[in-house]
């Protein structure tokens, strides 16, 4: 328990420090590092399912996307995604031993981790960007904490017993309320130009994205026959285990914030 707590404290302090003081390039560097570590674990799991992704190519793309986003914004991210698809097609055509499943796994891994996480960098570039990235991270933590506290005490109705037996609908509702509370604070304090109704909607959508990311990774691990994505974080498993809920949150929060008037 002490090891788990210490690991969580170090991870949290590094994350908060970079978000608040690291500016856009600092956040891009952290996202790239987390993405590469998570990508290594993702590709290792898929290899257990008899797939052969191009890990070197995939990890280079995951590392490059946050920096392309930091320098050129959305155009940089879309350009990096386009380059990824074109390079994957060339790789598939030139090497006859490469199967469609290998190419698809490589492209999906980069899109799932590198492209999605890079939206945190886009968030950082908005007005009140540091606060919005912090809200995205804290909303995931709030979702986890509220879902655990309620689910472990009064949770009776299983949400996805075949994928994540400990998740309950009661915990899901509590986690959603915790996430919504975070975005109400954003509406009340940050100058992001949101209405209360839009902030509530973002909170609900972010909660769904957080749980979806968690369940997807749980399904991925079950298919690969592993309990944890890795062993590098004592008491927490791997890096993908730590950021699975955050991966889709940045995407959902960014586009809903833009639609709600943030700039």
Show where each model-derived region lies.
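Juxtamembrane interface at the ends
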Residues: 147-148, 152, 218-226
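Juxtamembrane boundary at the C-terminal end of a transmembrane helix
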Residues: 255-263
């Amino acid at each position: 328990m002490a090891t788990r707590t210490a690991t969580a404290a170090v991870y949290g302090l590094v994350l908060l420090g970079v978000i608040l003081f690291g500016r856009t390039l600092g956040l891009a560097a952290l996202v790239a590092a987390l993405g590469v570590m998570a990508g290594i674990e993702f590709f290792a799991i898929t290899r257990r399912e008899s797939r052969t992704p191009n890990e070197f190519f995939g990890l280079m793309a995951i590392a490059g996307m946050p920096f392309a986003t930091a320098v050129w914004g959305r155009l940089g991210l879309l350009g990096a995604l386009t380059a990824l698809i074109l390079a994957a097609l060339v790789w598939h055509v030139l090497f006859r031993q490469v199967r469609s499943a290998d190419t698809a796994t490589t492209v999906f891994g980069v899109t799932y981790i590198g492209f999605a996480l890079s939206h945190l960098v886009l968030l950082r570039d908005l007005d009140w960007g540091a606060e919005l990235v912090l809200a995205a991270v804290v909303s995931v933590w709030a979702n986890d904490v509220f879902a655990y506290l309620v689910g472990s005490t009064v949770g009776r109705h299983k949400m996805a017993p075949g994928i994540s037996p400990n998740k309950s609908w009661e915990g899901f509702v509590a986690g959603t309320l915790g996430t919504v509370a975070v975005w109400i604070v954003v509406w009340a304090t940050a100058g992001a130009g949101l209405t209360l109704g839009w902030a509530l909607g973002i909170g609900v959508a972010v909660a769904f994205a957080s749980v979806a990311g968690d369940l997807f990774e749980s399904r991925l691990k079950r298919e690969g026959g592993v309990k944890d994505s890795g062993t590098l974080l004592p008491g927490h498993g791997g890096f993908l285990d730590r950021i699975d809920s955050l991966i889709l949150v940045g995407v959902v929060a960014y586009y809903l914030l833009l639609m709600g008037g943030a700039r």
